[in-house]
A protein has these predicted regions:
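Short, Lys/Arg-enriched N-terminal segments with co-localized hydrophobic residues
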Residues: 1-15
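N-terminal phosphate-binding or glycine-rich loops at protein starts, especially the Walker A/P-loop
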Residues: 16-66
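Short, ordered loop/turn segments at secondary-structure junctions
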Residues: 24-26, 53-59, 93-94, 126-127, ...
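Short glycine/serine/threonine-rich phosphate/pyrophosphate-binding segments
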Residues: 28-38, 60-61, 105-107, 127-135, ...
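Accessory alpha-helical/coil subdomains and C-terminal extensions
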Residues: 50, 112, 120-125, 131-143, ...
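Glycine-rich oxoanion-binding loops at beta->alpha junctions
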Residues: 63-119, 128, 167-169, 181
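C-terminal non-catalytic interaction/assembly regions of soluble proteins
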Residues: 270-422
């Protein structure tokens, strides 16, 4: 059972060790499990207080934070937090400028951290969040601050370097594969020629789109074609392949990345609504690729065509999260805090894959943040096969262990319970 905090300054004169945890970027089904892991480890390490940033670094700059002990009262609340989707603390897409450009932001932030007597800051996020940790740790070193800055990985895109995979990917892959399997069943009901295009998230990395291949099993034929953003997309060549498949079967199902680009690097649906502006880090906000391609194939081939955008469901379906993913999310959060208490800073917790007699085993370590921040990991080219229209068995072996297991969900009035913070 989680115990109440005891101020160590009142019990032996040990310096205050307050911890603050933040969440940043797009949420996942298990980002709150990472928060739970970080929180419980901070309690176990004897932190005096554990704060949560409300709205990430941007919120902290506005002095928005909460004492997490007021919300995570015991094991039950912690378990509910683990099954809560989205980011319980709130998130942001705030690009921290370089110190030389706006030193006043750093000065303000460190003044707030000093006021809260923060010993360790843990930021749960993806590439851009690790960039924030790198900048803050560099500034701390520059001014001689003893605050430790640690990152914990999070992204459904699975594009973080060094770590074998990222918490959030396994649950999203599980939801995508199950949804694809069910869509294939639904699309084959009628005796008529049809095409279904399923659009899946992933800006430059096709890990999530590739996970559609996991649907194939003894009871499912699987998708017919998979198109990833790692390779150039030829819409006419795609139409030819679909036409040939329709000559052999009534229903063709495609899984496509939201960010397909042609050989010139242009988004294939640029004439439609493929993106709607930029986020704070200059990334295009995607949407519309699946519908654009469905419209094109329907018109070109003269068949019924439907575009399905799984959208935020793939990252928010916490009720269907992978147990393996949740366990690893908890472990990475705990590892980041433990490393800080062991004197580490400017690092991120990472997952190492270990194979023991073909059984999936993992360990959690930490790695230098500079080897991770602003580096993007994509699907290996040798895993993209069949003229760039499918993925190899190596991908299946890589991804399958990450979607295994289900949690025992706590329900209320027939629906999963969620923990509200803020």
């Amino acid at each position: 059972m989680l115990s109440a905090f005891k101020c160590k300054n009142q019990n032996g004169g040990i310096p205050v060790k307050n911890v603050i945890i933040g969440q940043s970027g797009g949420p996942t089904a298990v980002i709150n499990a990472t928060l739970a892991g970080a929180y419980t480890e901070a309690v176990a390490q004897g932190a005096d207080k554990v704060y949560g940033m409300i709205g990430g670094i941007q919120g902290l700059l506005n002095e928005k934070y909460a004492d997490l002990s007021q919300y995570i009262i015991g094991d039950r609340e912690c378990d509910i937090l683990k099954q809560t989707p989205s980011a319980a603390l709130g998130s942001c897409r705030y690009k921290l400028p370089n110190y030389e450009e706006e030193p006043q932001i750093y000065e303000k932030l460190f003044k707030i951290l000093d006021k809260l007597e923060i010993f360790c800051l843990v930021y749960i996020g993806g590439n851009d969040s690790m960039d924030t940790i790198a900048k803050l740790s560099e500034y701390a070193k520059k001014i001689g601050s003893n605050i430790r800055f640690m990152g914990a990985p999070k992204t459904v895109d699975n594009d973080l370097a060094v770590t074998d995979h990222t918490p959030g990917f396994g649950s999203a892959a599980k939801y995508i594969a199950a949804s694809v399997k069910e869509i294939i069943c639904d699309s084959s009901v009628y005796d008529l020629k049809s095409v279904t295009v399923i659009e899946i998230m992933g800006r430059n990395a096709g890990w999530l789109t590739a996970s559609a291949a996991l649907a194939k099993d003894d009871d499912c034929c699987g998708v017919d074609l998979i198109y990833l953003p790692e390779t150039a997309f030829d819409i006419e060549k795609c139409a030819d392949k679909v036409k040939k498949l329709l000559a052999e079967k009534d229903t063709v199902v495609l899984a496509v990345s939201e960010a397909l680009r042609d050989s010139n690097g242009e988004y294939v649906a640029a004439s439609g609504s493929v993106y709607a502006g930029l986020d704070a880090f200059g990334h295009k906000i995607m949407s519309g690729t699946g519908q654009f391609l469905a419209n094109y194939l329907g018109k070109t081939l003269g068949v019924k065509a439907r575009g399905i955008e799984i959208s935020t469901l793939q990252r928010s379906a916490a009720h269907f999260a992978s147990k393996q993913d949740i366990n690893e999310a908890v472990a990475t959060g705990a590892a980041a805090v433990k490393a800080a208490f062991n004197g580490r800073t400017a690092e991120m917790s990472v997952i190492r894959r270990i194979f023991d007699n073909s059984e999936y085993v993992y360990s959690v370590e930490t790695a230098d943040i500079k080897s991770i921040a602003n580096i993007e990991k994509t699907v290996p080219s040798e895993w993209i096969v069949n003229d760039n229209t499918y993925v190899s068995d190596e991908f299946i072996k890589y991804a399958r262990p990450l979607i295994m297991g289900e949690m025992n969900i706590i329900y209320k009035n027939g629906l999963p319970m969620h923990l509200k913070i803020k």
